[in-house]
Amino acid sequence: WALSRERYWGTPIPIWSDGDNYVVIGSVEELEKVSGKKLTKEDLHRPYIDEITWTDAKTGSEFKRVPEVMDCWFDSGAMPYAQWGYPVRGEEQFQKYFPADFITEAIDQTRGWFYTLLAISTMVSGQAPYRNVICLGHVLDANVEKMSKSKGNIVAPDEVFNAHGADAIRW
């Protein structure tokens, strides 16, 4: 799994480098300490976080954040932990709701969300983050192709609602 992406938007990877050495920052407090700056929530996002640098007292070299961001699936896969801020806080909620009884998504999420949830959770806790998975299929058109706005083969929900009522859309 390629964890990093070379994109502008995304979760900044918390690694700073002077070209030869790397420092992994583990918390906002640690970043404030090494940079000597009081940070705001906005400072933790691009482009502001890329402006946070510091000079190493021993070598005089400047540390800058590496430009990559994390793959968006990492954020999704970290959900069981991130939603409570666990392990820094939220232990009671985490223990109460982990692992989830079930998760549900369309079948195309097998490679994305289901996998990253499982990969991160087994790496961190040694166990699956969910007990059951419910996979939904895709809604197909008259030619048995997946309906897609980009293909232009969707049925407009308001037309179905007006012609057949809300129950036809509720499933």
PLM features per residue range, with description:
Residues 1-171:
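Structured secondary-structure scaffolds
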